């Protein structure tokens, strides 16, 4: 009996790959979406499923509501890394209490100067070991920092709306520990347009920093980016266990960095028009936590990395609604050794700039290595892909489920079909389910 089982397992895997990589038509889908000039796009009927093959698709794909608790509440091991606030001390405290159009400042720290114009507060600091504690509510205020040293920014039940700029603007290239005080609710909102800034200063998000942003604490933070991005660092952003960050909406990206994004724990709920999380020049690492990602624009991705993406733990739930959007878009290599990814794409392919681009749960320009974890992808739009890799794909372990149901898209001499798993290089399956 064992020999029979061992014989059928590789045969079943082979049938699954063959079945889901064809362009089977499960129903009428929309045609191609043209983003550039000209016409000529269409949807073409695809081959029908061979009799009996539908039995191979005896599974469904859905978001598991228990993932938020199971992965979001996981603890994180504290190391000697400078990103862990446990390795730093902040003995000096400056408090700012917002109240409508004013702000009350308590500052007894030598080397820290605080000025205010109504509820718009500006800090200039030349000393280390300072904690700034923000609380209260303003509908016309902000918090801006110039500092030569790393500092702690405690959000202790604060709500800041700045109708003409960023709610928090950190003009410092040093590390900032953003701590949401336990059992507090914090809200940051910017305006739909910004007034002119000081020459040479960047300001492109509701919460902006020139340096690293390290999020932690047991409270919650909700950010709305009405102008551009919700949270931006010109360096990197790290999310630690215990944090609870919501991007209610963003006109561009939810989280945008010049460098990398590290997700070690916590709960992220990001809704954006553009990419939910984008790294312009860095990679993305996820070892724990829960990230629910929702995007609406064409070519807007759940995770967008210009380098490698490495996932060893945590759970990602991505729903991308725009044409040619991806759950994960990786310019480098993708390695998945643990955790859980569930991704849904629903739109059709997009013709733009002489290129025909389709939706995909995963799109990787480099190589993909899967040694563990759970991957579940459903792509229902025209020419949608489950996993689309320009390099090679190697699956040694883990669970991979893919459902694609879109029609073929044709534009002139270009065409694209729905595929479960597509690799331009080698596709090697050594194990897994």
Model region roles, listed by residue range:
Residues 1-6:
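Positively charged n-region of N-terminal signal peptides that target proteins for export
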Residues 9-13:
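Hydrophobic helical h-region of N-terminal Sec-dependent signal peptides
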Residues 15-18:
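C-terminal motif of bacterial Sec signal peptides marking the signal peptidase cleavage site
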Residues 20-433:
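A composition-driven surface/loop motif
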């Amino acid at each position: 009996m064992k020999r029979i089982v061992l014989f059928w397992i590789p045969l079943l895997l082979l049938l699954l790959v063959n079945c889901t990589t064809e362009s089977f038509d499960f129903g009428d889908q929309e045609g191609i979406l043209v983003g550039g000039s000209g016409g000529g796009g269409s949807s073409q009927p695809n081959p029908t499923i061979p009799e009996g093959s539908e039995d191979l698709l005896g599974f469904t794909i859905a978001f598991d509501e228990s993932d938020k608790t199971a992965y979001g509440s996981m603890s994180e091991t504290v190391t000697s890394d400078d990103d862990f606030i446990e390795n730093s001390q902040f003995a000096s405290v400056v408090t700012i209490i917002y109240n409508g159009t004013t702000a009350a400042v308590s500052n007894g720290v030598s080397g820290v100067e605080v000025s205010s114009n109504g509820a718009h507060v500006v800090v200039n600091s030349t000393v280390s070991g300072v904690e700034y504690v923000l609380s209260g509510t303003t509908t016309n205020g902000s918090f801006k920092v110039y500092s030569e040293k790393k500092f702690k920014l405690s959000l202790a039940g604060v709500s800041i709306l700045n109708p003409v700029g960023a709610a928090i603007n950190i003009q410092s290239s040093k590390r900032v520990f953003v701590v949401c005080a336990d059992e507090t609710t914090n809200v940051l909102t910017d305006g739909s347009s910004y007034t002119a800034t000081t020459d040479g200063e960047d300001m492109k998000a509701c919460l902006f920093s020139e340096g690293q942003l390290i999020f932690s604490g047991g409270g919650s933070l909700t950010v709305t980016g009405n102008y551009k991005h919700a949270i931006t660092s010109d360096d990197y952003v790290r999310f630690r266990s215990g944090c609870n960050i919501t991007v209610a909406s963003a006109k561009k990206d939810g989280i945008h960095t010049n460098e990398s994004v590290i997700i070690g724990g916590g709960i992220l709920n990001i809704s954006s028009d553009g990419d939910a999380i984008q790294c312009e020049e860095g990679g993305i690492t996820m070892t724990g936590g829960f990230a629910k990602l929702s995007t609406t624009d064409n070519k807007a991705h759940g995770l967008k990395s210009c380098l490698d993406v490495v996932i060893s733990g945590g759970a990602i739930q991505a729903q991308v609604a725009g044409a040619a959007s991806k759950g994960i878009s990786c310019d480098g290599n993708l390695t998945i050794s643990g955790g859980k990814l569930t991704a849904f794409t629903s739109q059709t392919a997009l013709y733009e700039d002489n290129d025909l681009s389709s939706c995909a749960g995963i799109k990787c320009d480099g190589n993909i290595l899967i040694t563990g974890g759970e991957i579940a992808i459903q792509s229902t739009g025209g020419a949608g892909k489950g996993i689309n890799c320009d390099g090679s794909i190697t699956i040694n372990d883990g669970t991979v489920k893919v459902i694609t149901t879109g029609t073929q898209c044709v534009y002139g001499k270009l065409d694209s079909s729905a595929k479960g798993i597509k690799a331009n290089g080698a596709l090697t399956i050594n194990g897994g389910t």
